């Protein structure tokens, strides 16, 4: 050690994770090939540092954390070898793993060393066997038994190995037998080093029956003569030792307190002392060049000592491979106006390295095949992992191409958008409308003949164009009169179950009667079902969505805790999830029914199996009886031999149904008489069967699955008799015989439908469909059953055999619904005559907010009747922005449209004395996060929908929706602008016969443009709407918009009666094309649209509105005066208002709106 040696660097040992504390270095070693210092820690990680500055180079987790600390590091020309208690690991110096060796007999490895063969290492420890490992192959080549527990090894003339008792054995390098053994220290050897013919050891001894202390002597042995030499005295306590790599008799001895001594073994009096600034030293190592010394301490630091003038770890080191220096491009002044070609591309004159020739591209290492989710219910713990019976979905020895892109795209090719079809038809010859209708009627799934029967079971997905969902061709998937349900809504996996419940007449009747009652509870699932069922019936084959119902379903904390929401289904199969949802739905609608009719047992008669459970202790015979009513019965399958199922009547569906309804189970429960847990028997006795029997298939075993695969196993009719506390079930010929014999008490059920999980193993995600016999719920008797498949919005007719056949592995029954045969066609529509309309005639508010002054609640003599016109306008806020996928070519595809929430509803009287006066103006409270209030268009500002801060009349969505639903079922006609979009966002289905949309009234057949309400107001009345002063950003006013739509409709009726509709539309569109279909600025002047040949002038009134003044039209046909409409008069689209002054009747109405251009 030269005189200028000093501490050059000090770095902390890197922590095991970014947020963890530093850890101590358990071993340090200098690399003999490159300028690297390697450090191992207590978490199995080894890290290298480059050069005297100790720059971090590589870091690798070589051993699992459970194996503890890294005990030793060795260096080979090919890589770095590390040792932990249970494994040996080799990596390249860049960090790539070469091999990892572990063995069941490796229980406590402590040390390793090279052998006489430089491509082999021997590893040993406190265990009874040593291993020889081939470095080139990374395999164990020999196992050697030993009677010693070795803790340290150093290779020289002999293989010197220290034991856990303080001895040191000299082992032969050829056969590893013990040649010589010394008792070096009393307790343990702490450190040792061997070089050439010398061995130096440091250790602990026990003195005066105390704890072990460091020996003040470092023992020296001559390996040539196998004899001890005089020890080296070191009063500070010799804890660590290293031999100098160049000076054969010089060694470094260090104490635990940091004192360093460089001593000549042949001349102990020649010493050189240094003091390292450490609190507690844990180890030292000297570089192969002898110019650097590394120290690790208990404060998680690594110190590097050496001469500042010269320091190299090796004499001849290989160059360390470092990352290429990235040359930064020249700075560029980047702005939105900078063209992209300014970036440029690099110049190259040779073939690019990335241009691989095809003959050099190979597929290596295919990814593993994905686990079939259908196996999850059948998994059972095994000795290693889990196991399940082979579903045999592939042929023997068939290899799956796992490199195929695992897309979840639907197998059905989506049809063209309606706008694309319109453009194509417009380019064809005349008669394009008829050709388009014929092409649409002949369209088949996938655009061709339906050769593959699995196509209709595939996933269906809505595609969106820039025109939104209205541009999607739903009729491509549904040519029936039964509506499907859309899929882009959270928890829409329940669509199949909702369809099944809708086609059960007795459930449908209960839901609709409850919806027509006085229930205004916000989270009433039964009301939402009634609204949905009514919407599906009114749609008559048009697509619908269960948005409001699923939003209510998502709001239940019980559903979230049960894990049946879509966000919790990652590790649950759809079949088990939908069965849990079935139990939750029926339990919740029973609760909702009791909130309005607590004393009625109507729902229990329809859905509940009335039963009692007797629990008997098998030890003392004590018996307890308690109610055992259930809304859902779960099928229980017996243990069976599948070979005998076909001819064993005990395995028929009727017998399994009987055993499931009247079940007997054995369990362990608390006995009050014995005062301990005892084996108990539980028996269920049925007293009354429901009118609707809901069953969960509960297919959890392969044997039960094979039972369902038997053709015809599921009957479409079953009979049940309760006789003397016993339940008897019949099917097939047995049932027909008892029906003919008029068996007393026999209840015949017919199968309404089945919810089925479809899991086609061709990169399709599992989904649910339902098979339903729609003939049962038809209002008129039908001669035969008609089965339909409901696959979300794909609806098609199927035959009965296909619906009830479950021998395909991808088709799993989940939920079954049976209804008494006497209730076939029992569609009760008396709820329409018993609507509770109280909500329309009284105020309802969450916050006591004041409605607008112009709003007047309906009076009793204003009760709406069929045909009563009502002007409607709504405002919405954005709850979610649209999800857009930008493709590589720059094109954009809407994956999921923006989600809107109803924020305001305004309804105005369309006739009578108070014509044009609003009676509904409700703001709707929204609990979901609002991402954009779109105030410019909605007029809704932050705080308007919060009950704590809003000054408006706030109501729940349920109340606002129910008011509109009541008006709809009272037969009112809704007048508005763009009503289709409003109805869709409100999630209500209004027949076309009850809709007057001015967007379609003022539509020119030869023009592909729909006019805005703002432009129409100016074009027809020369009035400006949807405008506010420049310093105000209030946005639209729904009352103003609804009132203008009502006026436009009545003006259109005037045009229609005068026979000038086409001329007026031509004039409106001609003027609009000049102005860009926008109103001109207020300070501009323009001619008022009038009948051809009529001169019109414009005058600016003090009111701020441009009111036209029209002189008498010469030669114009006489127009009779009109009489005001009244609520009692029947509504007719053409003659609800005859041409007249174009104003609303009632006091002051003329001053409010101004005159008509036709006056």
UniProtKB/Swiss-Prot annotation:
Gene from which this protein is expressed: pan2
Record note on cofactor: Binds 2 metal cations per subunit in the catalytic exonuclease domain.
Record's GO cellular component terms: P-body; PAN complex
SUPFAM superfamilies, alphabetized: Cysteine proteinases (SSF54001), Ribonuclease H-like (SSF53098), WD40 repeat-like (SSF50978)
Subunit comment: Forms a heterotrimer with an asymmetric homodimer of the regulatory subunit pan3 to form the poly(A)-nuclease (PAN) deadenylation complex.
Source species of the chain: Aspergillus terreus (strain NIH 2624 / FGSC A1156)
Domain comment quoted from the record: Contains a pseudo-UCH domain. This ubiquitin C-terminal hydrolase (UCH)-like or ubiquitin specific protease (USP)-like domain is predicted to be catalytically inactive because it lacks the active site catalytic triad characteristic of thiol proteases, with residues at the equivalent structural positions that are incompatible with catalysis, and it cannot bind ubiquitin. It functions as a structural scaffold for intra- and intermolecular interactions in the complex. The linker, or PAN3 interaction domain (PID), between the WD40 repeats and the pseudo-UCH domain mediates interaction with pan3.
Residue stretches of biased makeup (Polar residues): 1096-1106
Range of residues in the leader sequence: none
Protein known as: PAN2-PAN3 deadenylation complex catalytic subunit pan2
The keyword Nuclease is annotated on this UniProt entry: yes
Protein EC: 3.1.13.4
WD repeats: 276-315
